[in-house]
Design a protein with these regions (language model features):
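Hydrophobic core segments of alpha-helical transmembrane domains in multi-pass membrane transport
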Residues: 1-2, 43, 72-79, 114-124, ...
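Single transmembrane alpha-helix segments in multi-pass membrane proteins
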Residues: 1-31, 55-61, 195-213, 245
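Membrane-interface helix caps of multi-pass small-molecule transporters
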Residues: 3, 27, 31, 51-59, ...
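Alpha-helical transmembrane segments within multi-pass membrane transporters and channels
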Residues: 32-72, 217-218
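Helix-loop-helix "hairpin" substructures at the membrane interface of multi-pass membrane proteins
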Residues: 34-42, 47-53, 104-182
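Transmembrane helix-bundle core of multi-pass membrane transporters
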Residues: 64-128, 155-158, 177-187, 238, ...
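Cytosolic-side transmembrane-helix boundaries in multi-pass membrane proteins
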Residues: 120-121, 140, 147-154, 225, ...
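Transmembrane alpha-helical segments in multi-pass inner-membrane proteins
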Residues: 167, 178, 182-244
Length: 269
């Protein structure tokens, strides 16, 4: 999500991509498809959805907010039609997946290692490649980036594919940790937690600012908040109120710190 926001976009379908792609893949594994085949099925589904989202935003020029919101509902409906269960379990005896979610290397849990490796890879991509610099240019001033010769439409498609790949990787770790995929998460607050991670981490909603370190900070803050909810036994209704207030406050603060001038706002809309 952070990458999309840096580019002045948004993707509300990320959680649905994770749950939908892996629910279908787990059903196929239960039907006899090898583990590697199931992993590739989930990967293919995620990539296709990312391409469709990107094409709708870049070439059809539909608003990203509504495209990805609609995509989330479509993914949920199709996945639940194909795998009509709130919880789809992974086949038994899959040590590689189990190790990925519950294993340790030198005492460090594998999910943390996967997260750090993905964060480093994304940091290098954004900071050391021309494509990464183009993404920042797009978020800072789309019209100037276009006049500089940057092909924004293919770049936007690539951004949504990358987000889908991150969702696929998150699902892989999720299954390794829990041994299942829960379609119910598409109807919960996880998508708002993802947005909170981005906003609280300091990635500007007007685009062009922030980075991987911002996402790491946001993850730490949200992790602390969720742990506090658990320790204090805060009920779900109050949790949602707090989430909403924190998100609104963070958006107002971001808008105050990074105001969009009239010309830039017009170019990005």
């Amino acid at each position: 999500m952070g990458l999309i926001v840096i580019s002045r976009g948004i993707d509300l379908s990320e959680v649905a991509i994770m749950a939908g792609a892996w629910s279908v893949a787990l059903i196929e594994m239960q039907n006899g498809v090898p583990i590697l085949g199931g992993v590739l099925i989930a990967l293919a589904i995620a990539i296709v959805i990312g391409v469709v989202n990107g094409v709708m935003v870049a070439f059809v020029e539909a608003p990203a907010l509504f495209v990805t919101l609609a995509a989330g509902f479509v993914i949920y409906g199709l996945a639940f039609w194909f795998a009509p269960a709130w919880v789809v379990y992974a086949p038994k005896d899959v040590p590689r997946l189990t190790f990925l979610g519950a294993g340790h290397v030198f005492g460090v849990p594998m999910p943390i290692i996967v997260f750090l490796l993905a964060a480093v890879a994304m940091h290098l991509f954004l900071s050391r490649t021309s494509t990464g610099r183009f993404i920042y240019s797009q978020g800072d001033n789309p019209e100037a980036a276009r006049m500089a010769g940057i092909a924004l439409r293919p770049l936007i498609v690539l951004e949504y594919v990358i987000v889908a790949l991150v969702a696929w990787l998150a699902g892989l770790v999720w299954i390794g940790t829990t041994g299942s995929m829960q379609m119910a998460i598409t109807q919960g607050t996880m998508v708002f937690d993802v947005i909170l991670v981005v906003v609280l981490g300091g990635i500007s909603l007007v685009g062009g600012r922030g980075g991987v370190f911002s996402v790491v900070v946001g993850c730490a803050l949200i992790g602390t908040l969720l742990n506090a909810f658990t320790i204090m036994d805060v009920n779900s209704e109050v949790q949602n109120i707090i989430r909403g207030v924190v998100l609104l406050a963070a958006i107002i603060l971001d808008n105050w710190l990074h105001p969009r001038d009239e010309e830039t706002a017009r170019q990005g809309d």
